[in-house]
């Protein structure tokens, strides 16, 4: 997608990417760093997408638009991100439902799966790794729980703690779902983006579009690089979380009442 909102087809040809309609195949892009305990790194410009359904896994989509199965997963995946700080060894991080609990998994550049914990509370959506500047949670995996409204921090040793209560409406298809950290160098020339998924017959049916919150509006709301933005699935009610010695939570924005937000909050970060 261009800055003007023009969409260009990608990975649509033979050998490209396709998945079933209905599930939530979140995606991420990994960095170029060497993965701990390996002799490899993730391929440049490769997208990694969750494959829900009967054979859960991760699909790798190369810059040439070709897709291949990259890893198998032991449970139903609910979120994916890449470790950019190195506290998780620069691996892919995935949350997956397993029976009554959630597993947090690290996947290396060879597609091997390493459990971090198999007893985490429910978490899903736009999970993200906190930058080192994010107080005592720097480098932790941050994940929302839509049913309770809690924001969790998962440490590399598998410990899970509550970072904050969102203070927003909570419940299935209502509560906190999407998260993203404002990048270094973010300024008036940047923006935040969030998918508004079409979900027919839902209380929040969505518009099958991409929402944009301009940089000047975020700056006016007191948002700074390194802050965490979190939005609810229903209506994209948005908070900013700032953590230093302690954490603060402020409400800053909302989408339309019909908005059905899903996935990561993504950014363009140029200063203006």
What annotation goes with each model-predicted range?
Residues 1-272:
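Sequence/structural signature of beta-propeller domains
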């Amino acid at each position: 997608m261009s800055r003007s909102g023009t969409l260009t087809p990608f990975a649509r040809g033979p050998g490209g990417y396709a998945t079933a309609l209905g599930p939530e195949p979140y995606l991420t892009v990994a960095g170029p760093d060497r993965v701990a305990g390996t002799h490899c790194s993730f391929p440049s410009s490769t997208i990694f997408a969750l494959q829900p359904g009967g054979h859960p896994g991760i699909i790798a989509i190369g810059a040439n638009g070709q897709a291949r199965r990259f890893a198998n997963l032991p449970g139903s995946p609910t979120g994916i991100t890449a470790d950019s700080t190195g506290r998780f060894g620069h691996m892919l991080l995935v949350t997956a439902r397993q029976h009554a609990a959630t597993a947090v998994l690290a996947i290396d550049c060879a597609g091997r799966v390493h459990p971090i914990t198999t007893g985490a509370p429910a978490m899903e959506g736009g999970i993200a790794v906190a930058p080192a500047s994010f107080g005592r949670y720097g480098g932790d995996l941050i994940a929302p729980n839509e049913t309770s409204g809690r924001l969790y921090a998962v440490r590399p040793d598998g410990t899970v703690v509550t970072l904050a209560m969102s203070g927003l409406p909570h419940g299935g298809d209502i509560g906190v779902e999407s998260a993203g950290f404002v990048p270094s160098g973010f300024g008036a020339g940047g923006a935040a983006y969030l998918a508004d998924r079409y979900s027919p017959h839902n209380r929040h049916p969505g518009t099958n579009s991409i929402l944009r919150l301009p940089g000047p509006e975020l700056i006016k709301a007191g948002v700074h690089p390194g802050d965490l933005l979190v939005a609810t699935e229903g209506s994209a009610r948005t908070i900013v979380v700032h953590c230093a010695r302690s954490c603060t939570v402020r409400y800053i924005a909302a989408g339309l009442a019909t908005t059905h937000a899903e996935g990561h909050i993504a950014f363009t970060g140029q200063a203006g």
